[in-house]
């Protein structure tokens, strides 16, 4: 037998091998079909819809309750579908080359479950209120500037007036010598310089006009020198309610003080009427000679001199006034022609004065009569407190009254002496 050469043998083997390798296995990354014994997962939803998962519900807005409920329902359906697929195709997933992708999807499913649980807890909780960046109303009310109530306003006004009164009294009474000397010297210098100045005529209209010219020149120069680049921001000056209230609070104490003093002066009391009437009569009679500048000058000098002198020499002045009163009373008591003197004085005044002066003289006489009547007659309401006070006095106070009684004895002796002199005068007149 002839044996075949080796190269022929190799050719036949290569041909068979080529035939076997003509149909190579189609390897692909697709899923390996499961065995026919394993049942396919029955799901009416296609695979595309399952893979196209909805976005994470945490990214959606949580403002509306209806949107939250819809998201939770959709997530629950997706989780159920994935669970069914996992039960049926677990073996295929193990045999599939896409295990990393499936594990990734499983982790996403676990995250979605946790998100669903969080959403359910959020739905169960009550809706939260919106937080405002601003402070609460109580803090805002507390931070606002407190306004003076109507009840605290009189107290503040009274405190301001008391403070002003203390400052003026300290200056006038020379308690602080340095300040009083400074103000007195400055006032004297200004008034004396104005007295020696000649040809100076002050007018309110001219002063306002000059001030307006100065302001106009200043505004023009500032506008020309300080020009801005096409941006002229003009400040709009306007008066607001706060400005009006602030100015009213400043002016209110002085206004209330003026009203109270005016009502006190014109109250109609006899004592106050006798004090105010002479000044008003002098002002009405010689008002044309009094100017504002002279009045301020006299008021300045008198305010810095008279109060201090009166406080230093009060006792001496009161003693001299009492002596003058006693002498006048003694002379009037000794006079035997009282009616003649009174009648002559009344007729002279009536003939030498005008009708206006007569009317005011009658008015002053009526006020004097009422004042005397008010001082002499005591009402029962005033007598009862005096009696109660006398009963409540202690023994030391009674001891203090003993020297006072000893002092009244010489006064009674002085009163008896004019009566004896009157008797002697009457006897001499009869003789």
Swiss-Prot record:
The keyword Cytoplasm does not apply. The chain crosses the membrane at residues 177-197, 202-222, 286-306, 349-369. It is a multi-pass membrane protein. Residues 12-26, 142-152 have a biased composition (Polar residues). It is found in: Endoplasmic reticulum membrane. Residues 1-110, 126-152, 382-422 are annotated as: Disordered. Residues 168-355 form the Reticulon domain. Residues 382-415 have a biased composition (Acidic residues). It holds the Pfam family Reticulon. Keywords: Endoplasmic reticulum, Membrane, Transmembrane, Transmembrane helix. GO terms for cellular component: endoplasmic reticulum membrane. The keyword Translocase does not apply. This is Reticulon-like protein B17. The gene is RTNLB17.
